Amino acid sequence: MKTRRQMKIQEIINNQVIHTQEELAELLRKAGFDVTQATVSRDIKEMGLIKVPTSEDDYRYAVPGTAQPLSTPDRLKRRLRETVVTVNDSENLVVLRTIPGNAQALASLIDHSNWEEVIGTVAGDDTILLVVKPAGAVPSVRERIAKLMQ
C-alpha cells in the first residue's frame, strides 16, 4: 500500500502544482487512499521531495532533479533583500545568514544565476556557504550581493 501511495504521490507531483501537504492529501483521498496529513508528511520525507519556487512567487513540491527553479535577477534581488540578515567571508568563502527556512531557496537561486566566481553553494536552514574561486573574487561577490540588496 505504501509503495502504491508513494507512486501516486510522484505521479501527482509530476503532473500538478501542489503547494501544501493538505492539497496532496486531498488528491490522494480522491484517488482512493486513506491518508492523513501526518502520513503524507512522512511520505514526503521518505521520498525526498523538495519545494521549488514557482513563477507566481510561491513554492510547490517537486521530485529532486525534475524541476528547475526559476531564476531571474529580480527574484534573486527580492530574495536577498527579504531574507539575508548578515554577510561575512573568510578566505574563499562567503557566508550568508538568512531568516530561518530561507537558505535553501536562496542558494538555489544563486546556483541557477551562474555566477562565474561561485563554484557552488551549501545551504542549511538559515545559512548559505558560497564557495568562491579564485579567492581574490570574494570582494566582488560581496559587492554584487550588496548591490542586489540595495
UniProtKB/Swiss-Prot annotation:
Subcellular location: Cytoplasm
Pathway where this protein functions: Amino-acid biosynthesis; L-arginine biosynthesis [regulation]
Keyword GTP-binding part of the UniProt annotation: no
InterPro entries for the chain: Arg_repress (IPR001669), Arg_repress_C (IPR020899), Arg_repress_C_sf (IPR036251), Arg_repress_DNA-bd (IPR020900), WH-like_DNA-bd_sf (IPR036388), WH_DNA-bd_sf (IPR036390)
Coarse class of the protein's main subcellular location: cytoplasm
Gene Ontology MF terms: arginine binding; DNA binding; DNA-binding transcription factor activity
Region forming the signal peptide: none
Record NCBIfam families: argR_whole
Protein family per UniProt: Belongs to the ArgR family.
Function: Regulates arginine biosynthesis genes.
Protein name: Arginine repressor
Species this protein is from: Desulfitobacterium hafniense (strain Y51)
The organism's taxonomic lineage, starting at the top: Bacteria, Bacillati, Bacillota, Clostridia, Eubacteriales
Gene that encodes it: argR
